[in-house]
UniProtKB/Swiss-Prot annotation:
This is Flagellar operon control protein UmoB. It comes from Proteus mirabilis. Up-regulator of flagellar flhDC master operon. One of its GO terms (cellular component) is plasma membrane. The keyword Acetylation does not apply. Keywords: Cell inner membrane, Cell membrane, Membrane, Transmembrane, Transmembrane helix. InterPro entries: IgaA (IPR010771). It is found in: Cell inner membrane. It is a multi-pass membrane protein.
Length: 702
């Protein structure tokens, strides 16, 4: 639950960060924020005075006689109040155009067209400090090198058509870029086609990212509690639909650039213009320096010094020249296959497969899903031989009822390579027809228990009738302990440890409490009755040390016997069937001894083992579930792993995991195929385009 909440929180934060990034990026791209500047631009709010001047200028221009002769296709509109004024530093480029017989200038900062009022044009220089305001159409300049439009408001009425179409630069040092020389006639302006747009924009990164985000949200929903499932699934579906919509119906109309269509004479200028015909960067049209695609270089010279039809972007990048050279036709006939989104899909598929593998066992999800698809009836079994003879398969459902023994195969500890025994782990049921195993018995443990009881009785007496009451009270007040059956302790120690090398520390301690020099002599005196009635006084510290020594000595014997019983119980007879819960759930309900809140002593562990063995070595059971695995071990025992039947919601999670896994695998293979195929097509694309142009320009006359 905690992991699920953490994953959900991470995704929510990621979505918030992505949304904020897109929002601020869009703001940066809106209006004048995207205008390039040679120095760091500054920003301020549009004042009321500036807003009024812009409104007066645009209103006067739109209602005056200029609108009849001047193209208003890219004329600015009234900006919104509170718009930002950007102060930047850059070079202004201009070229001439004609519309309905009227010449006019169009101004650009790099590839961005701007509107400069004619009254501010005389103040332009080689590098200019401009105050630019964004409008719904194109930006308008309200200040040039310290001269502002509001200072020229009184001259609005003096504007003439000649000033508008051919502004005079009164400043002799003004050096804006302009297209002089052979005339270039602007025929019309159009929007770029979808094919031209795809060449430099349609990478599919955002579309693929939205689809991957939807799939990852679906993966997250399968790891979340039920309460979050519908909401996260709905969010993931929304991103998927949006991504698919953008792939098949991209919203590109508002993002298309303008294409300027010219007719004019191409010239080769510059340092290499007279002798180096391999240069494609020194060709111009009416003073406009042109930028060509590199693979057009062998074919451009056919149109030099000829009147040619040409289409280009505002940044002077040519996209069509003459009857043959055309990026539109190239993309239409030999499309460039982009595979960025396919790479994103591959990474997303690998991530989903990895998360499914780490978070939920994939084999279990698939087995339970196949079991649900088969919709088989449970196999009712009352005898283990039916399981041995039946043709069972993974995914089948069984219901077993009978009498067996709680048993789980022992695990192997990597630390000490010793079998770890958990008494009667009822997550496994051993089922056969052999006689039930006997309850564990041990005479050694009974002897150890007798010694423990005797020492406990003397060091912590409840009532002692063998000692004078007044003497007992005096001993207690003095902080001493009385051993009034010292010979009994000696005899029971000898009975537990008959060998000379056993219980050496305990034997030495008892010898030190007597007047005898060695253990055999002490035992002989106790057996002869010479120590009968002998009382031994011990200080509290000595009594505590003796008690701990007896506990330690007897514990080693008890644990040894428990290990022997574990080996016996871990060695059931061969054959039969072992039903195991792969969820480690208890298949039999039984009452465990939970009276003590402390760790049980070795003797208590032995008593609990005896109590449970009497119950669970031969216990009735009724269990069932979906078979998730079957194996026959070295003893010939058929081990069947069962998973309890999930409820409808859990089954839905398992089915969702399986379907998402198969989808991710198929998605991975499909996109790997697309990546390889598209790379091969792109490698052959330029060769096919070159063959096409060779055929167009150099085909033999018919």
């Amino acid at each position: 639950m905690r992991l699920s909440v953490i994953i959900l929180a991470i995704f929510m934060i990621s979505l918030f960060i992505m949304a904020a990034f897109l929002f601020f990026k869009r703001r940066r791209l809106d209006g004048s924020y995207h205008l390039p500047s040679l120095a760091k631009p500054t920003y301020r709010k549009l004042t009321q005075d500036d807003y009024g001047v812009i409104s007066d200028y645009l209103s006067y221009f739109g209602t005056s006689k200029f609108s009849a002769g001047y193209s208003l296709q890219n004329f600015p509109e009234i900006p919104t109040k509170g718009e930002v004024v950007t102060t930047l530093r850059n070079i202004v480029n201009r070229f001439a155009g004609s519309s309905e017989g009227i010449n006019h200038w169009r101004y650009y900062i790099d590839a961005v067209e701007i509107h400069i009022p004619p009254l501010l044009v005389p103040y332009l220089q080689q590098e200019n400090v401009l105050d630019v305001v964004c409008t719904p159409s194109i930006p308008i300049v309200i200040g040039v090198n310290g001269h502002f439009l509001k200072d020229e408001k009184s001259h609005f009425s003096a504007l003439s058509l000649k000033q508008l179409s051919e502004p005079i630069l009164s400043n002799g040092t003004s050096t804006i870029q302009k297209n002089e020389g052979d005339a270039a006639h602007l025929l019309h302006i159009r929007q770029e086609t979808n094919e031209e747009y795809r060449l430099h924009h349609s990478s599919g990164f955002w579309n693929g990212s939205l689809i991957c985000l939807g799939l990852i949200l679906w993966l997250t929903a399968l790891m979340m509690p039920q309460v979050f499932l519908p909401w996260i699934m709905a969010a993931g579906g929304t991103f998927l639909v949006l991504g698919l919509f953008l792939i098949y119906r991209p919203i590109i109309k508002s993002r298309k650039q303008e294409v300027h269509c010219f007719k004019g004479r191409l010239k080769r200028w510059g340092l290499f213009g007279n002798f180096d015909h391999g240069q494609v960067k020194n060709i111009s049209l009416g003073g406009i320096d042109l930028v060509y695609p590199p693979h057009w270089e062998p074919y451009i010279q056919n149109d030099i010094d000829k009147v040619t039809y040409l289409e280009m972007y505002p940044n002077h990048h040519v996209i069509k020249q003459g009857p043959y050279l055309s990026l539109h036709d190239e993309e239409k006939n030999y499309p460039y296959k982009r595979y960025i989104k396919n790479i994103i899909f591959v990474v997303c598929s690998l991530f989903i497969i990895g998360m499914l593998y780490l978070y939920q066992p994939l084999s279990l999800s698939m087995k339970l899903t196949f079991s649900w698809i088969k919709e088989s009836e449970p196999h009712l079994v009352t005898n283990f031989t039916e399981l041995e003879t039946a043709k069972l398969h993974v995914g089948d459902i069984i219901q077993a009822k009978g009498v067996g023994m709680c048993y789980m195969p022992p695990n192997l500890s990597s630390k000490n390579n010793k079998t770890i025994f958990a008494p009667f782990d009822c997550s496994g049921i051993y089922w056969n027809n052999s006689n039930p195993m006997p309850m564990p018995e041990s005479s050694t443990i009974e002897k150890a228990a007798a010694l423990l009881y005797l020492v406990e009785e003397q060091l912590h007496p409840v009532s002692n009738n063998r000692v004078n009451p007044s003497l007992g009270q005096a001993i207690t007040k003095s902080g001493m302990n009385l051993l009034d059956n010292f010979d009994g302790i000696i005899l029971k120690t000898q009975d537990l440890c008959p060998r000379e090398n056993e219980c050496i520390r305990l034997k030495m301690a008892l010898v030190n409490l007597s007047n005898v020099n060695d253990w055999p002599s002490l035992v002989q005196r106790a057996e002869s009755g010479k120590l009968t009635g002998t009382n031994v006084l011990l200080r509290a510290v000595s009594a505590e040390a003796l008690e701990k020594l007896v506990d330690t000595t007897t514990s080693s014997f008890i644990y040894r016997e428990i290990d022997k019983a574990a080996i016996l119980l871990n060695s059931p007879p061969p054959g039969g069937v072992l039903l195991i819960s792969d969820e480690r759930k208890q298949l039999v309900d039984y009452a465990s001894n939970t009276n003590s809140v402390f760790e049980p002593t070795p003797l208590e562990q032995w008593r609990e083992l005896q109590r449970l063995s009497d119950i669970l070595l031969h216990t009735p059971f009724n269990t069932g579930g979906v078979i998730t695995g079957m194996v026959i071990d070295a003893n010939g025992t058929l081990q069947i792993f069962l998973h309890s039947m999930p409820d409808s919601m859990t089954l839905l999670y398992y089915i969702g995991n399986t379907l998402l896994l198969f989808f991710a695998i198929g998605f991975l293979i499909l996109n790997l195929f697309f990546i390889i195929r598209r790379r091969r097509q792109n490698n052959q694309r330029m060769h096919k385009i070159s063959q096409y142009y060779e055929h167009c320009f150099y085909r033999p006359p018919q």
